[in-house]
Amino acid sequence: AIIIGADQVCCTQSGIVLHKPGSADRAIGQLTQASDQWLTFYSSLVLIRNGAVAWSGVESCAVKLRRLTNPEIRDYVMVDNPLWSAGSFHAEGAGLRLIEKIETTDINVLYGLPALALLQALRELNDPLTYASPI
């Protein structure tokens, strides 16, 4: 068996980490700071086999947010409740409306699981998913 672990962090261009906010006020503050800026999402991936790290890596995704108004930010946070999301938004939900541009080789990195890297790692470990396996 292989244990798969993944997590994500978001950074501004100036290197400030936008942690999972935990509160609406912090989410509003982060989105206000990130408005009209490029953000980089880093998604880590670790595979454990027989109690040892068998594979690890980090993939990135660059996201440019639109220029957001204060009411738009408040409304978004109240509706989508992104309190446990790096960067304070859910790109797979209503947060997609906040985005102007995305640059990545794997969109799944933005969602927190670098799926293409995971599939490559499983192939390298001779444990690939079959087409009958759900992803």
Which functions belong to the PLM regions below?
Residues 1-135:
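Anionic-ligand binding patches
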